[in-house]
Amino acid sequence: PKGDMSISTFAGHQWVLDFSANDLTGIFTASNHDCIAKIDSRSRRVAMKQSPPAPKPDSTPASKLVIREHNVWFIRKDKKDIQLTRKGTEEDSFLNEFRYSPNKRYALGFQSTRVIPRKIPLLRSSPKDQIQPTIEFINYPKPGDPRPQRRPILFDLKKKTAIPVDEASFLDSWSVQFKHWSKDSRSAHVLYNKRGHQELALLSIDASTGKVTDLVRESPDTFVDYSQKTMLHWLDQSEQLIWASERSGWNHLYRIDASNGQVINPITKGKWVVRKIEHVDEKSQVVWFSALAIHPKQDPYHLHLAKVNLDGSDLTVLTQGDGTHRWEFNPERTLFVDRWSRVDHPEVAQLRSARDGSLVKELARQDISALLKEGYSMPIRFSAPGRDGKTMIHGFLIQPTELDPNRIYPVIENIYAGPHGFHVPKKFGLQISQRRLAELGFVIAKIDGMGTNWRSKKFHDHCWQNLADAGFPDRIAWLKAAARKYSWLDLSRVGIYGGSAGGQNALSALLHHGEFYKAAVSDCGCHDNRMDKIWWNEAWMGKIGPHYEQSSNVFHAHKLQGNLMLTVGELDKNVDPASTLQVVDAQ
């Protein structure tokens, strides 16, 4: 109470706070940047609103479904229960997971194969309570491992029968998730993601026949960014939905007729991307969303707030300041506090109108005068064309406090090229770890090359089945352009370091670009993507194939040039420590 704590986490990881008695104090999803989770009465209200509601007593008499010995039974008040399925087994059981139609006549359930997850050993060499080492085994599925195969099945609670659903529509799945019942109870909607992440489909299941039809299907030549860009919002007052897609080459929102899957209209369009659906007001037919690159003259990674009518008209960008923004609305959503900054611009807080974004009042400006008196210098934002000679690559440089422009300084790139996000900070901050290194006499570079997220689909596609690329042609082009502008950069002495995926990237720099990078420090790298966690690697590499070996640092270890330092934590539960040791063995 009335305290604070700091935790390290990864973008996309979710934290559930004080889970007890079905009462959540807060739910927090980590972003790509430093963020603050404020825990109070409001966070509890939001958490409980986002949580699945507790099952309500069924208002239809004698309509409860339960699982007995892996099969579905219909429970009657007279205790003359009826068995509805007979094919369930321990290895392929029906699940205690039923979604009832609005009229209570139908229920959608699932049958799923059982998968025993892979376990990996972690060696604790120096336990505190004994002399001898200990081994801990943890569940750790890896690319290519089997996935539970879920298939939907319908139940007619009036006729007390099971309605088979064609399983061919759900074969070889990564996931199969219930999403929605139609208001008239005629169809259930399920989201199907095929293994390999190259097909994502919203399927409609006829409640009376079990027939499956496509409503929306995404099947790009490369991959669907399922983990980051799956955005689906049902419009309760109509049989319509909002669906996000990169079919235009940019991540945008579309209004879909849920009765037939036809696109009613694009809601957003242009050479920018929707980052998140923030709020939908069905009464006024307006959707609020966050966007990147919506101000073409700003850094394309600056986050802005906008709104647009569901028919695609009256697009209004509500934030204007040349920086990245975060916001908080009043309960009536008539006003919002807009906080924005850049790496080279302290934070500004403004009160704005939610109607048109007009400024009501400036609330505060961050004062860094004391910091400047201590010799603090702003990061130098810089952009230059990448490998294609036209796509702009963005990053920044951090220089030593006492930089002598008549000297030349070795350069160290701090790399993390994970395709789930972009990784160059955009808001104002001290960049303490990089500054400490700069004060030793280096210039530190942070760059987002092609293959990272939240630009165009083409920009992102460079990562597909090719994590070894890591945007290096763009990074090298950026550094060479920076050296032409800043004569104190010495590109004959370029080093690189990173951890996790950044550890993989750092070693890859010496293996594939040893003529440019002369030294690397690689911490806990996922050096062979077949050794790392299943979800992250299959998201960008797809199914197991020869391309995994081609991106493996272990496979290419014989190409090593320059000086390499490897570090690893023996109890690392995020990246299998064996990944680093296999690199050592390959040398």
Residue ranges of each PLM-predicted region?
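Short Pro-Gly-centered beta-turn/loop motif in secreted/extracellular proteins
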Residues: 6-12
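Structured interaction patches on ligand/partner-binding surfaces of diverse proteins
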Residues: 20-45, 123-130
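Conserved beta-propeller blade repeats
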Residues: 51-65, 89-107, 136-145, 149-151, ...
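Structural motif
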Residues: 69-73, 116-122, 149-151, 197-203, ...
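Short loop/turn segments that connect beta-strands within beta-propeller blades
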Residues: 76-79, 157-160, 206-210, 258-260, ...
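Predominantly five- to eight-bladed beta-propeller fold
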Residues: 81-98, 109-165, 355-369, 423-433, ...
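Beta-propeller fold detector
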Residues: 81-86, 163-166, 212-219, 264-269, ...
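Serine-hydrolase catalytic core recognition
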Residues: 185, 191, 324-587
